[in-house]
Amino acid sequence: LICVDSDGCAMDTMDIKHFRCFGPCMVHEWELEQWQEPILARWNEINLYSMTRGVNRFKGLAIALAEIDQQYKTIPGLSDLTGWVDQTKALSNSALEQAIRETGSECLQKALHWSQQVNVSINQLDESLKKPFDGASQGLAAAAEFADVAVVSSANRDAVLEEWGKYGLLDHV
């Protein structure tokens, strides 16, 4: 069995999604515009240019907001988010919705809204920006001759299926 991550491994989409969607949506949701430049630079460092590259969106959000809380602006209810990230069995919108029903936390509500807006923003990216790396299809085809190939991703399932389907990558898994 060969497991292949989607964003940043098969699909050349990781950078654009963080540059145009994840970080900017966080800045907007938490009204951080006055510190946008350093905050976005740090978001990209956490999610693209460090050992935490590819971390789940909610873990990346918790890391970034904890730093923002210390350096720029108090993030009300931050402990609700960090506690949920540390304790939940699933880092997903549906698990977050359940936690909101149980706690009513405003910070968790903002995190859910941010995540939903990220998905909307990703869906609005021009299709020319969501392509596989050169050679991805051929590499997957070669791997599939010798092993089962599976997609593993913390990215939105529907987006992964759409992106992989559009370029014929699903034919190899």
PLM-predicted stretches and their roles:
Residues C9-L161:
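Alpha-helical substrate-recognition element adjacent to the catalytic core
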